[in-house]
Amino acid sequence: QRQMCIRDRVIKHEGYTVSYNSDYKIANWVAYELTSKEATSKKNERSNKFVSDPMVKGATAMNEDYTRSGYDRGHMAPAGDMKWSAKAMRESFYLSNICPQKPGLNRGIWKDLEEQARLWAKENGSLLIVTGPVITDDLKRLGKNRVGIPKTFYKVICTITNGKPEGVGFLFDNKDYGKTPLKSMMIPIDSVEKVTGIDFFPSLPDSIENPM
């Protein structure tokens, strides 16, 4: 398994770090910590201004790639987790943090998971979250900048409770899940690692990479 930061351009922003895939013009992964205070902050509202990431050198996705494509501009690190800082909120709309998502996924179970993660952060004090698309060699492309369209997305969440680490993983195909309950989609982090080839928390023993 590869460690998270090998061979990819890693960019650090205020609220998240992104490993950027310059071929597909989307993230390999986006990682950030979400504290209880950040999860409950109401300081800044959504900016809704999608722009190219100024730290991405070379070709990048543009808003026009998504126009009339049938895909949403789906956040990896959600805007709702960035209300604690105007800069973090603004940077969450960088297109390096965005992937083409079916509207039914982006506005459905993916949004449910974002809201659930904020609840877990409130309860547990702090979460480590890594999220992104599953990168494969055969992704279809979108728009004139040939943005990769992921078939699958993942999210892994880890917390330290009473000195003991716990974690949970999720994998979603790029489709509408209707009324599927979030709980039924929980899997061990280890299962996500097998699909992505990424070792998310190398310093943690495999035994903890089980559902919270």
Name these PLM-found stretches.
Residues 7, 15-20, 154-159:
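Short, surface-exposed beta-strand/loop micro-motifs that present aromatic residues
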